[in-house]
């Protein structure tokens, strides 16, 4: 009933904000009202940033990390000071940010693009696994840290990859982040100290 007293444009914004992960209806209302009260310049800046998301953000064809549209490859991949023979395998691009904040990892990354989840219609064929095998060969990768989330889907993906790579005859040492990360917690939400300990205590598979 209360929606009927709000302007249509404001309701549309509330609905759009409310569709974002982790944004409750009440939070969406607060955000929308804040934007309404903000200056035109701030609103236009936000709108411009949103409009440029799909035109100025690209994906690295090797690591599948997010890059600027005018870049060819990820800076973390082309940085010669980083060890290309050590690869951390993550589900999503934001997981890279979480691991980088620890300051403990000097290898490179490979983004799977998700985790195996039959209920969501995500199978191995939807993930960047063939490209991973190609990277292992081309960069002579010696260790693969499987840093998928500590969730049912993340664990299933880790087990699948271990068996898949072994069956494919891919010779690479595989390890898994230590159990410092609570079950059910996504990598991007883990604190830096916990992630640092998880990296240091990773176990061979």
What residues fall within each predicted segment?
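Extended, structured, electrostatic nucleic-acid-contact surfaces
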Residues: 1-21
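Conserved phosphate/pyrophosphate-binding and hydrolysis machinery centered on Walker-type P-loop NTPases
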Residues: 3, 21, 40, 53, ...
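Short Cys/His-rich Zn2+-coordinating modules
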Residues: 9-16, 38-60, 71
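Extended interfacial segments that mediate partner engagement and assembly in macromolecular machines
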Residues: 28, 79-145
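Long C-terminal interaction/binding lobes of large macromolecular proteins
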Residues: 39, 102, 133-205
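Cys/His-rich short segments
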Residues: 49-96
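Conserved nucleotide-binding/hydrolysis micro-motifs of P-loop NTPases
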Residues: 68, 81, 93-96, 115-118, ...
């Amino acid at each position: 009933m209360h929606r009927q007293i709000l302007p249509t444009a404001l309701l549309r914004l509330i609905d759009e904000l409310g569709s974002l992960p982790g944004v409750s209806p009440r939070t969406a209302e607060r955000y929308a009202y804040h934007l309404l009260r903000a200056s035109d310049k701030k609103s236009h800046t936000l709108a411009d940033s949103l409009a440029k998301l799909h035109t100025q953000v690209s994906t690295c064809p090797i690591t599948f990390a997010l890059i600027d549209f005018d870049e060819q490859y990820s800076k973390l991949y082309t940085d010669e000071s980083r060890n290309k023979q050590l690869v951390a395998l993550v589900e999503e691009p934001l997981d890279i940010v979480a691991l980088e904040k620890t300051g403990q990892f000097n290898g490179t990354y490979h983004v799977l693009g998700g985790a195996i989840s039959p209920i969501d219609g995500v199978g191995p064929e939807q993930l960047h696994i063939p490209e991973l095998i190609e990277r292992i060969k081309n960069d002579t990768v010696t260790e693969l840290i499987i840093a998928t989330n500590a969730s049912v889907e993340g664990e299933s993906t880790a087990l699948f990859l271990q068996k898949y790579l072994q069956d494919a005859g891919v010779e690479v040492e595989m390890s898994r982040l230590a159990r410092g990360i609570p079950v059910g917690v996504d990598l991007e939400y883990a604190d830096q100290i916990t992630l640092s300990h998880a990296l240091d205590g990773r176990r061979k598979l």
